[in-house]
């Protein structure tokens, strides 16, 4: 039976079945191939899409805009300072108004409850471009990238380790995605940075049906052994105060992905992924502030790892992730 997701919200992966998630990944792969060959057919001509960004963005905004334009849709970007949302107008009222003007709405912002409310009252499909709790569109891109870089394998045959802050929206979403798709995921982090226990329990229940393997560990060598992919994210998420940096850097330093971690996988074909942005040098404002405050010892190790001539970046069109292949 054909899969139809017409008029469905996409707020979190927990709302979707494994078959529906696989359908979206396959669709993205086919659209990407069609664009590359010059045969993409526009199916959204005459449609209008609102992009609400209460948090700033580079890749997510560009991905939504380019994808919409490629499919023939028009977009309206509503930035952090360009609307009355949350100031003079509630999200419920905003949803009702925009739902009458637009055919779909993307939201990137704060609490998951906000995008859920938007989805409840808009009357048109709403897509989650990131909340504090989840980042489902990023996970679709990540799973697609994994398949592209593991030819001949299916998602249940793949394993990956996520190192760092596993309680953030990426840790949460990767765990959900892996559970849904029957994958082997290892969340490698200090115990205080593991995902919420209720979500872990929910994912383990899903895994009991899909065959997924979920491991939470503080031991880096145990967590990364024989994985196909290593994944990490920034240690300090958007909106977190600078006062949190010192403790975070101290706690996360052992979970930095560097050459030692690559070697510990014992997999010569392991690949590295980062959802970006990444602070790996002093070439950004935040990077300079961190280096001035906490030094560059660990970064220098990372620079040598990233600059090795046998490593190369391969940005994947419409995925938002960067694999590094040895």
From Swiss-Prot:
Q: What class of enzyme is it?
A: transferase
Per UniProt, the keywords (alphabetical) are: Amino-acid biosynthesis, Arginine biosynthesis, Cytoplasm, Transferase
Q: Where in the cell is it found?
A: Cytoplasm
The disulfide bridges present are: none
**Which residues are listed for L-ornithine binding in this entry?**
169, 233, 237-238
What is one cellular component GO term in this UniProt entry? cytoplasm
- The residues that hold carbamoyl phosphate are 57-60, 84, 108, 135-138, 275-276
SUPFAM superfamilies reported for this sequence: Aspartate/ornithine carbamoyltransferase (SSF53671)
NCBIfam families with a match to the protein in the record: orni_carb_tr
> Which PANTHER family is this protein grouped with?
ORNITHINE CARBAMOYLTRANSFERASE, ORNITHINE CARBAMOYLTRANSFERASE, MITOCHONDRIAL
Record protein name field: Ornithine carbamoyltransferase
Q: Give the organism the record lists.
A: Escherichia coli O6:K15:H31 (strain 536 / UPEC)
UniProt lineage: Bacteria, Pseudomonadati, Pseudomonadota, Gammaproteobacteria, Enterobacterales
Q: Which gene encodes it?
A: argI
């Amino acid at each position: 039976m054909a899969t139809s997701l017409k008029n469905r919200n996409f707020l979190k992966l927990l709302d979707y079945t494994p078959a529906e998630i696989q359908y979206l990944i396959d669709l993205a792969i086919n659209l990407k191939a069609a664009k590359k060959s010059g045969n993409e057919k526009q199916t959204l001509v005459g449609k209008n899409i609102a992009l609400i960004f209460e948090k700033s963005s580079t890749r997510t905004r560009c991905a939504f805009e380019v994808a919409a334009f490629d499919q023939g849709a028009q977009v309206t970007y509503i930035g952090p300072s360009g609307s009355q949302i949350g100031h003079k107008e509630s999200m419920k009222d905003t949803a009702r108004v925009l739902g009458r003007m637009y055919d779909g709405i993307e939201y990137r912002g704060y609490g998951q409850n906000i995008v859920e409310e938007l989805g409840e009252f808009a009357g048109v499909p709403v897509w989650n471009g990131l909340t504090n709790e989840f980042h489902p569109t990023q996970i679709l891109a990540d799973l697609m990238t994994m398949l592209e870089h593991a030819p001949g394998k299916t998602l249940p045959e793949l394993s990956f380790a996520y190192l760092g802050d596993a309680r953030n929206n990426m840790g949460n979403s990767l765990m959900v995605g892996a559970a849904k798709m029957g994958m082997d995921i290892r969340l490698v982090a200090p115990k205080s940075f593991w995902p919420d226990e209720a979500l872990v329990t929910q994912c383990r229940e899903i895994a009991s049906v899909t065959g997924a393997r979920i491991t939470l560990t503080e031991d880096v060598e145990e967590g990364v052994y024989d994985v196909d992919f290593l994944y990490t994210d920034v240690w300090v998420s958007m909106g977190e105060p600078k006062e949190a940096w010192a403790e975070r850097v101290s706690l996360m330093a052992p979970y930095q992905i560097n050459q030692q971690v690559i070697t510990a996988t014992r997999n010569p074909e392991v690949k590295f992924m980062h959802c970006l942005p990444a602070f790996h040098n002093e070439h950004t404002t935040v990077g300079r502030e961190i280096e001035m405050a906490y030094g560059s010892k660990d970064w220098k190790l990372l620079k040598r790892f990233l600059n090795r001539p046998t490593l190369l970046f391969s940005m994947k069109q419409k995925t938002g992730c960067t694999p590094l292949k040895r």
